[in-house]
Amino acid sequence: MTALIGRDLLSLADLSPTELQELLALATQLKSQQLNLRCHKVLGLLFSKASTRTRVSFTVAMYQLGGQVIDLNPNVTQVSRGEPVQDTARVLDRYLDILAIRTFAQQELETFANYAKIPVINALTDLEHPCQILADLLTVQESFGTLAGLTLTYVGDGNNVANSLLLGCALAGMNVRVAFPVGYEPDAGIVAQAKAIANNQTEVLLTNDPELATKDAQVLYTDVWASMGQEAEADNRLPIFQPYQISEQLLSLADPKAIVLHCLPAHRGEEITEEVIEGSQSRVWDQAENRLHAQKALLASILGADSE
């Protein structure tokens, strides 16, 4: 994966289809312990949003690669007192080998990347969540043996996960459908990018009809109805999103061998029922584990880890 050495990952659109497949192949090798890589570098985590899976998986991945991790809580850095992002970026560039940022605005992430010479990884913004989708695609590939030609349906809020799924599925040669209530559509710019990548070779469908979107799909995916920072809207969103719940009834419209994904945390009884998330078609826990393997592959590729 020499092509990714020293590069940022701010969006899945930063990858080519070949680079995506190579990342997933490396993740599979690392997961099966067929390859022992070491990089001995220092990763900084600058997270302005709460995190369980992203924080822990990045930390464990870096330790397993022989590196070190510094957790940079913005609340105890000068960022919280108004230090300009560009100044912080240029200072961290002198201390760290790579930086993963979890923040609200995509623009803040891009400013860090513009001013820091070290690689910057998008660990979640309001616009995209590329590392999550790497794990999602790895999980789908493990379940079906391939990605090309499969149909993934996302049901719910057109949020950062939906945006990155549009890009990731298009890059992987998958059909992607997003079902959402009126007014909660994915980002228009991301949709245009996904359609350009798909180039009419695969389906990119946006609809307000969850049943239409689910029909014969091999993967059914959902996320919370109110993302971080939208907690005040949660109660008002409940009746709007109720028809977009992944239930056994909706799942019955999908391919009989369909799998169910959720990036977690889940609000059982809202976007997904208890029966579905705990059912035989759920791959949610494999999906969560694969955050570790996908991000380890990403770190190893960007840092140019050596085999031992």
Which role fits each region the language model picked out?
Residues 38-141, 268:
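Phosphate/diphosphate ligand-binding glycine-rich loop within oxidoreductases
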Residues 278-308:
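C-terminal helix-to-coil terminal segments
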